[in-house]
Amino acid sequence: MAANMYRVGDYVYFENSSSNPYLIRRIEELNKTATGNVEAKVLCFYRRRDISNTLIMLADKHAKEIEEESETTVEADLTDKQKHQLKHRELFLSRQYESLPATHIRGKCSVALLNETESVLSYLDKEDTFFYSLVYDPSVKTLLADKGEIRVGPRYQADIPEMLLEGESDEREQSKLEVKVWDPNSPLTDRQIDQFLVVARAVGTFARALDCSSSVRQPSLHMSAAAASRDITLFHSMDTLYRHGYDLSSAISVLVPLGGPVLCRDEMEEWSASEASLFEEALEKYGKDFNDIRQDFLPWKSLTSIIEYYYMWKTTDRYVQQKRLKAAEAESKLKQVYIPTYKPNPNQISTSNGKPGAVNGAVGTTFQPQNPLLGRACESCYATQSHQWYSWGPPNMQCRLCATCWLYWKKYGGLKMPTQSEEEKLPPSPATEDPRVRSHMSRQAMQGMPVRNTGSPKSAVNTRQAFFLHTTYFTKFARQVCKNTLRLRQAARRPFVPINYAAIRAEYADRHADLSGSPLKSKSTRKPLACIIGYLEIHPSKKPNVIRSTPSLQTPTTKRMLATPNHTSLSILGKRNYSHHNGLDERLMK
């Protein structure tokens, strides 16, 4: 029973689809709806398969930089299978919340911030264990590091001088190191200073009465007097008193100049009501993450202003009321919920009584169960025997997984063994809405084929950026020098076989010294049409003897300077070969 009891703060699996992997979430709240059902407010975590390839490359680059900084080579000691399974354990934290039915919970798991001091094998050895190091924002598609930095160095810390010996004097000039703002040995008594501060508060209250914006924010006299009693008014009055040599008359004259009384306002008064509401909303969403609050809610405010306002806001009655309200809500909310073991998965292939099981719940599409020894093997571990089989992938592919690999697929979002089809599989595209297009793309991805454009605007893939490949002089020279190694015609027939550039570069380096003096042969260029016409006029070709017809059958013919080629189809006996069409026979005859 304890295994099926879920509490606030637990990391759990959620099932939103019978064929897709589980969602990994953290329970923040458990709320009971009006219908009596229990809903869980959860924090979202994302897998590698849920984000784009561009962000995956950034995440791998970040992991590589961390590995280089720590000077560890743990990744090099891992096998291909371990590296493949380690990617399934990586998650990306987000600040996104959602509400899901509590009945969709399928089990507990553990998620922790990546600990650089531990070996990555510790995450593979533990079941249902995941780690994260980056924060993913699904709205703007960005990745950020979820940890602070230790600011060490002279830029952030003071240089500690060496300890002075007994009787040794400090040669530093203290006036340059410190600024004196108050003298405790002043000629004024404490009572006189307190009376001066009362006058300063009265001046601040009168200044707020004259200021239009302050009178709107503090409509009553009590609120104006409370605002005038804040620290900024007292600090300004004490600083004024010190700068005027503790002369009360001159200090009061500075507080009340000719233009009107001096008004000192802090961040609590500078912020408007709408800005205060935005701050409370951001604080509810992000907590005390002031950088995110400034970036998403208050970009026109400085970080210093936001932090100063936060600590002043904690001294107000509104903060105390919200704290009591949250405590009362927490007492009334559910602390835990019991979710019984759910019904079997619909993708389970039933072989009882010879009845076929539905594949992926498709209507009218059935999968004929075969003998495990004669049927398809598991798509992950290639096992032929299992106590239970599950349909996996598109219905028409009739792929299946054994019970062990199916549980691994649901929990970790991938197949156990690294396969070529999974390496070449494209990430899921949430923009594709046509189910036929989705099944076609998944079918091609499972077989390791690149997805091609079908011509439909719905399935059209974004075109890549156009580029121009400019061949250098040395590349052209290498094509002639390294013909035997390059074999351009054979390489053109096998476009997916890579060319050994190292061998070509080595041969080019060996033969470049011998052929450096010989010039590069230029290709023969075709002469312009005007030159050819002039040559034919000067050297006309001999006309063959042709039997002339009778005058009655003669038809007027027009002379042409160049005969147009006849493109009509020839008979089988009169068909020309490839060399004749390309003019190779005339060269051989000459």
Curated annotation (Swiss-Prot):
GO terms for molecular function: chromatin binding; histone deacetylase binding; sequence-specific DNA binding; transcription coactivator activity; transcription corepressor activity; zinc ion binding. This is Metastasis-associated protein MTA3. Acts as a component of the histone deacetylase NuRD complex which participates in the remodeling of chromatin. Plays a role in maintenance of the normal epithelial architecture through the repression of SNAI1 transcription in a histone deacetylase-dependent manner, and thus the regulation of E-cadherin levels. Contributes to transcriptional repression by BCL6. Residues 148-259 form the ELM2 domain. Transmembrane segments: none annotated. Residues 4-147 form the BAH domain. It is found in: Nucleus; Cytoplasm. Pfam families: BAH, ELM2, GATA, MTA_R1, Myb_DNA-binding. InterPro entries: BAH_dom, BAH_sf, ELM2_dom, Homeodomain-like_sf, MIER/MTA, MTA1_R1, SANT/Myb, SANT_dom. PROSITE patterns: BAH (PS51038), ELM2 (PS51156), SANT (PS51293). GO terms for cellular component: cytoplasm; nucleoplasm; nucleus; NuRD complex. The modification Phosphothreonine is found at T454. Belongs to the metastasis-associated protein family. GO terms for biological process: negative regulation of transcription by RNA polymerase II. A zinc finger (GATA-type) spans 378-402. The modification Phosphoserine is found at S429, S518. Component of the nucleosome remodeling and deacetylase (NuRD) repressor complex, composed of core proteins MTA1, MTA2, MTA3, RBBP4, RBBP7, HDAC1, HDAC2, MBD2, MBD3, and peripherally associated proteins CDK2AP1, CDK2AP2, GATAD2A, GATAD2B, CHD3, CHD4 and CHD5. The exact stoichiometry of the NuRD complex is unknown, and some subunits such as MBD2 and MBD3, GATAD2A and GATAD2B, and CHD3, CHD4 and CHD5 define mutually exclusive NuRD complexes. Interacts with BCL6. Interacts with NACC2. Interacts with PWWP2B. Keywords: Cytoplasm, DNA-binding, Metal-binding, Nucleus, Phosphoprotein, Zinc, Zinc-finger. Residues 266-318 form the SANT domain. PANTHER family: METASTASIS-ASSOCIATED PROTEIN AND MESODERM INDUCTION EARLY RESPONSE PROTEIN, METASTASIS-ASSOCIATED PROTEIN MTA3.
